[in-house]
Amino acid sequence: MRLKIPNVHLLAVAFACTPFATVYANNSVGYRGIVSVQPAPKVLNAQEKETFAAIYAAIRSEKWEEATRMIDAAPQGPMSAMARAELYLAPNSPKVDVAQLQALLEAAPYLPQAELLATMARKRGLEIIPSRPGIRRFSWLGGAPKRDLPANKASDSVRAKLQIFIKNDQPFAAEQFLESKILDLSPEALTELRYRVAWSYYIENDDASAQRVGAVAQAAGGAWGTQASWVVGLAAWRLGDYAAAYDAFDHVARFAGNDDLKAAGLFWAARAAMATQQPQFIQPKMQKAAQLSETFYGLLASEALGMEPIARSVAKVGKFDWTSLQNQPNVILAVSLVEIGQNKRADAALRHQARIGDVRQHANLAYLAGALNLASTQFWFGHYGPSRDQSTSTARYPLPNWEPTGGWRVTPSLIYAHALQESNFRTDVISPAGARGLMQVLPGTAQGLARARGSSFKAADLDLPAVNLEYGQSYLEKLRDLPITSGFLPKVIAAYNAGPSPVARWNSEIRDNGDPLLFIESIPFWETRGYVAIILRNYWIYEMRENKPSGSLKGLAQYMWPKFPDANGTVTTRRMIGGTIAAR
C-alpha cells in the first residue's frame, strides 16, 4: 500500500517548511447531526409514569405514609418492588419488621438493593435469608490507549528540589544540581531525573542540550530511558538532525511500554525516514503505527496511508435485541426508571443485571444503555465485564441523543470528545477545583457566559446535560474566537484544558516551525499535551460513529493546521511556514 502523499511533496511534508502551491484546503465534512440510534422501548403508560414519579417524590420528601399507600396501590411488579426497597432503605424512614423484609426478598430477589435488604434482615433476626442470584465479579476489559509516564524512581525530596529549578526555567541549574547528586542516586532514579532535565532544556528551546542530556539517559535504558529517547528525537528533529531523530524515534517504537507512545515513535520515525530519503522504512513504520488503531498516531497513520481505519470497528453503532431482554426484571426496571427521570437508579439496575444475568447479554445491555441515553452506564459496560470475550469497545464511546439548551452550534462529535475525557459522561461529577458535570465547566466560567447573554445561572444546573453542554460549547466558541488561538483546533483544545493564558505564552515560546504535530508534542504541560491528542482521537472516532469524513484528520495527516469546525461541521486546514500562515 502506498502513502497517500504526492512524491513531489515528500520532503515538504516532512519538514513542513516549504511553501506549497496550495496552502488552503477546504475539507467539507457536512454536519448532519447525530446518527440515529435504535429507539428505546417504552414500558410504562401515562398513569404509571405519574404514579411512580409521585412515589419517588414522596420518598424524597420523607412523606412515608403517603409513599407506602401509593406503593401498595400501584401495579405490583419490578417497579413497585424497587420503590418499596427504596422506602425501606431510605434514611429516617420508619423501621421495617423482619416479615416485610423477608416478603420483599422472596418476591424480588433480583433487586440491586437485595444484599442491603438481606443484611438488614439478618441484623433484625432473620435466620434463613431468601436465596438471591449470585453476583459475578467483573474484570477490567481495557480502555483506549493513553500515554503515561513510568513510575517515579527518584526520592521525593531530590525530585522536588530539581523541580524548583525546572519550574523557574533554569535547566542548566537543574543539571548542575543533578550532577552534584549522582553518587546518591540509583541508576533508575538518575535516568528519570536526566529525562526531566532534558525535557526542561527542550521546552526552553535549547535543543542541543536537550539532545545531549537525553542521549545519556537513553543509553541507560529502561522505561525512563525510552522517555528520554522521545525528547532526543524531538530535539534532533528541530535541529534538522533527521538521522539522529530517526534513531531516537525508532528506539521509542521498539521499547515503548504503551501503545500510544509506541505509535508516536513509529509515526515520527516514518517522518524522519522521509526527511532522510529512506523510503524503504516509511511504509513499514506507518503500517505498524496504523495497527495501533485506537491511538492518535495510529489514526493519523491510517489516513496517511489511505487505509480504512481499523478503529472503525470501535465506532460501529450496535443494536440491542429487545426480545432477549424484555423478560428480565432489572431491564424492565431500567427502562421504566428512565421514563420517570430516575437515571441513577436505572444505572444501578442495569449494572446489577449484568452481574447476575447471562454473560452473553453483556453487549446487549450496553447497547440498551446507549438507547436509554445512559451514557456513563454504557461507558462502564465498555470497560468492565465478565471477560474480554463479552467486551464491546463501541460502548467506550457513548453517543447519547442529547441537545444543548441553545441547540447544536458546535458539532456533537467534538463536544462528546470533550465530555468523554472530562467526565466519562458522569453528569454530576465535581472536580477538586469545582468544575462540574459532563464538560467539567467551572461555575465562574458559566456565570460569566450567562451574564454576557443576560440570563440567570445556578451552579447546580450544570448537572443537567442540556445546560452543561450549552455552557461547554459556548466556552469552546469563546476560545475559538480569541486571537491567541486563531481558531486553530489544537490550540482551542489546549486552551480548554490549560486556559487561554498559557496558550498565549506558548504561541511565542514553542518553536514548532509551523508544524501542528510538533506544536502538540512541545506543549510544556504534560496533562495538556496528552489532552490535545486524546480529544482529537476521540473526535475522529466520534466522526466515524456519525459516518463523517474527517477534515481535521485529513489535514493533520498532511501536517496542516485544522481550524475549529464551523456551524455545519466543516473543517478547513491551513499550511503554516515557520510559524506563520503561508501566502496564497
Identify the residue ranges that each predicted region occupies:
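Catalytic glycan-binding domains that act on GlcNAc-containing polysaccharides
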Residues: 77, 85-89, 98-107, 111, ...
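Bacterial N-terminal signal peptides that target proteins for export
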Residues: 2-10
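Alpha-helical, heptad-rich or low-complexity scaffold/stalk segments
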Residues: 26, 36-126, 130, 134-135, ...
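Sec/Tat signal peptide C-region and signal peptidase I cleavage site
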Residues: 20-25
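TPR-adjacent "capping" and linker segments in tetratricopeptide-repeat scaffold/adaptor proteins
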Residues: 37-48, 144-156, 183-189, 316-327
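Alpha-helical tetratricopeptide repeat
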Residues: 45-55, 84-85, 155-162, 192-195, ...
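Bacterial N-terminal signal peptides
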Residues: 12-19
